[in-house]
Every structure is written in structure tokens, then in C-alpha cells.
């Protein structure tokens, strides 16, 4: 959903302080002239190439001049620079067009496709994949997945992605994140056997995992409770029954 508001004196902002950007708080704004549509009118777009805490502010001063400030969110952010060290701030991509919001979007799209995306799939057609999640949730084993792959192959699907539930003792969403070893009760022959069987059906094999998260009920958390993001001397705050690993630690 596109949210529009008129500029006014003072500061308006969008920001994220949750450690991520994504669809919740997209690090993007567009300033458009009055009357601009999808096909016509002036528009300036700015997008931060950054997935962490960010802030984008639009300020209109007493002379009706507009200043746009975009970058790392300053809340709780510090960075110590030793002599001769450097710091690289997030890059921003800025677009101007007088052909409306649609052309702005297309310019962003072409720019990212040509200059930002490094995937080998950039210029080729992506495979069609089917994911096990909505079909089985946590209730599957290797035979059920192979049968799933067999039916998917009939529809021209190119890849089966095995989703959540294949690791640790994961039978629901409240355990085992961080224990990235195969649940052999479900995958009796292990990963290699399952992959070979899915490949034999003519499908590639993909696997889901969430390496940045850790469940309180996991071997990893029991061994290293200090590895999750936390504030010393305060009770940890779970979200979705899980914690976030502190990826700034080399041991993590």
C-alpha cells in the first residue's frame, strides 16, 4: 500500500529500529510534485541499499526549502573509529523523472537488475518451485516429500523446497532453531538420500533454514544462552517464540 502525505513545515520521517527494513518499513521515499500520476509529473525517489535500522527524514524550513536526510538510524548507534580506520555508510540510489511514479519504479528496477543483483539468475528465467510449508507444515517425512515431488513434476514444477520442520526435534514453532542437524525420525535416510530421490523425480532440491534465529528450547541456546541479542541484567524478550543470534560475535 502506498501512503501519501503532503510536505509541511517541520520534519516528517519513516524509520526502523527493529534491526531490519524489509516490507515492514521499506527504506524508500518519493517526493512528487502536486498532480503527479503514474504516467506524468515530476518525482524524486530515494532508496537506501541497507537492511538494518534506518531513518529517512524530510524537512521543510521557514523558507519552504526541502531537505531530505537518509541513513543509519541514530538511535542507540555508535561506532568507534581508531586512527587510520574508516567507516562505510550505506549507499543510496536516487532517481529523478518527469514521467511519473511508474517511470521512477522502472528506472529503479532496471538499475538494480543491471548493477546490483549478482545472482546467476539475474538474466535468466527462474525455476518454478513448490514449497512444502502450506502443504504439510511440520507434518512430513521423506516419503511424503518424495510423493509431493512426484505430483509436482507432473505440473512442470522445477524445484521442491523443503521448509521448516526438518531439523532438531522441531514439531512446532517453539523449538530447535539453531540445531541444524537432520531430524532422522522424519528423514530416515538423511538429507543425501532425500535429495537423490527428489532429483530422481526430475526436480531440483532446495532447503529452508533460518540461521540468524535461536529457540529457547534448543541445544544451542542451552549451551550458549549469551549468544542471543540481549541487554545485560534484563530478561530476554522473545518474539515469535524465538530470539535473534548476535551476529556481531565472531564465535556466533
Model-derived features: positions:
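Aromatic-lined carbohydrate-binding/catalytic grooves of carbohydrate-active enzymes
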Residues: 121-252
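N-terminal accessory beta-strand-rich subdomains and adjacent acidic, glycine-rich linkers
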Residues: 1-112
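Long, charged amphipathic helices and adjacent flexible linkers at domain junctions
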Residues: 108-128
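Histidine (H) residue identity feature
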Residues: 9, 23-25, 34, 109, ...
Amino acid at each position: 500500500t502506498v501512503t501519501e502525505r503532503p510536505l509541511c513545515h517541520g520534519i516528517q520521517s519513516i524509520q526502523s529500529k527493529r534491526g531490519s527494513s524489509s516490507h515492514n518499513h521499506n527504506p524508500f521515499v518519493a517526493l512528487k510534485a502536486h498532480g503527479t500520476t503514474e504516467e506524468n509529473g515530476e518525482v524524486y525517489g530515494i532508496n537506501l541499499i541497507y537492511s538494518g535500522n534506518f531513518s529517512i527524514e524530510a524537512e521543510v524550513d521557514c523558507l519552504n526549502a526541502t531537505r531530505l536526510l537518509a541513513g543509519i538510524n541514530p538511535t542507540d548507534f555508535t561506532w568507534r573509529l581508531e586512527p587510520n580506520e574508516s567507516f562505510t555508510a550505506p549507499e543510496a540510489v536516487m532517481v529523478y523523472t518527469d514521467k511519473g511514479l511508474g517511470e521512477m519504479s522502472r528506472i529503479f528496477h532496471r538499475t538494480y537488475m543491471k548493477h546490483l543483483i549478482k545472482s546467476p539468475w539475474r538474466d535468466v528465467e527462474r525455476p518454478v518451485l513448490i514449497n512444502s510449508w502450506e502443504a504439510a507444515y511440520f507434518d512430513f517425512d521423506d516419503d511424503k516429500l518424495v510423493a509431493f515431488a512426484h505430483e509436482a513434476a507432473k505440473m512442470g514444477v522445477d524445484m521442491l523446497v523443503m521448509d521448516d520442520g526438518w531439523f532438531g526435534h522441531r514439531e512446532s514453532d517453539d523449538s530447535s532453531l539453531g540445531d541444524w542437524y537432520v531430524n532422522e525420525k522424519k528423514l530416515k535416510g538423511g538429507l543425501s538420500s532425500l535429495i537423490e530421490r527428489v532429483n530422481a523425480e526430475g526436480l531440483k532440491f532446495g532447503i529452508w533454514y533460518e540461521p540468524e534465529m535461536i529457540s529457547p528450547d534448543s541445544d544451542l541456546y542451552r549451551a550458549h544462552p549469551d549468544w542471543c541479542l540481549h541487554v545485560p541484567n534484563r530478561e530476554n524478550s522473545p518474539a515469535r517464540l524465538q530470539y535473534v543470534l548476535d551476529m556481531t560475535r565472531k564465535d556466533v
